[in-house]
């Protein structure tokens, strides 16, 4: 079974909660159900699980509930395990099929607080828009993402000692042990192909068969397309959203990687088109990276919501959509070819999984910074991502560091190199993005 950091997050909720239920959201196929089931079996004597898509009778019963008593009675009627106070986890899955159940959490935990409750579902960003209210103070939540790079390394049997070597090298800005550095670099190249979708990772780890891997990935891509058709508001929106989704690989291959709304459907109001882009983001399928007018803290103040790059939630799916030629090049370590979009997609999903908001900066006089992230203490970090050998060519980063009004102390280049620190620029191995959350 794949080791997921979300299990630690669930355990922390159980340890620290007072009366809150927990909502786990995230895109389809990122492993929510599996992790919550593992959590239930590990930390509780009993697990009562209702899936509102697999069990339409349970869905119908819950939809008819008007009170906490009605809801609990419906849960008990379809429970396949015992409801024992203090020893049972109640897991309601696919709650996007019954979003109003979330509004009843407050009354459920107040009336039947001797049980723990976890809700989960996909497309919650779109499916929960119409609910009456979300109970503030009675619902904790977090978002799950595909396996991050460290989780992928654990799936590939990388030792804790090797991971700690990377972490220590990052803390002390020193070079990683050469053997470990080579292993991590090779695994990062592999991660660009496999990505972090659990079904894809599991298939590759067990078989090392790229064809089996692509079957799993293509199945997920097809599922996302079906979800768009099923859950979009109308046929016109479904067609436009599917076109945006299918255009992501081609758009990321453009020099500026920015979406041009006119390429999707000419003549459509900008606000309508924005909603279609946001549908993919709300569903967890895509990761928008917004432009900022100034790379200064707080970045949100200068965000331009109508100018953004759009990445997929998983680099493996992007590589799958790009075709076998790209996979062959990566398998043959032909990283000299310009696959910057794949590298940037991997960096975007890693940063997002670790809680960073995603921004980039572009200015005619300075140029473009691939990513700009911020820390709570007011520190802004500009990041350049380099997939080729000329990683020390970064005029935009140099100009941004020299701009006194920005007040940026240090910049980072993520590249195919071991650690090098020169002046106010840190050249770090591209896989070391996994450590940024620890700074």
Predicted regions and their residues:
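Domain-level recognition of nuclease-like catalytic cores that cleave nucleotide substrates
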Residues: 170, 416-439
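Conserved lysine of the Walker
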Residues: 32
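Interdomain motor-coupling "hinge/lid" segment immediately C-terminal to the ATP-binding subdomain
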Residues: 129-253
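N-terminal pre-Walker A segment at the start of P-loop NTPase domains
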Residues: 1-13
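Hydrophobic anchor at the beta1->P-loop junction of P-loop NTPases
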Residues: 24
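Short glycine-rich substrate-engagement loop in P-loop NTPases that contacts/grips substrate
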Residues: 54-85
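Accessory nucleic acid-recognition modules appended to NTPase machines
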Residues: 205-379
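Hydrophobic positions on the alpha1 helix immediately C-terminal to the Walker A/P-loop
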Residues: 35, 39
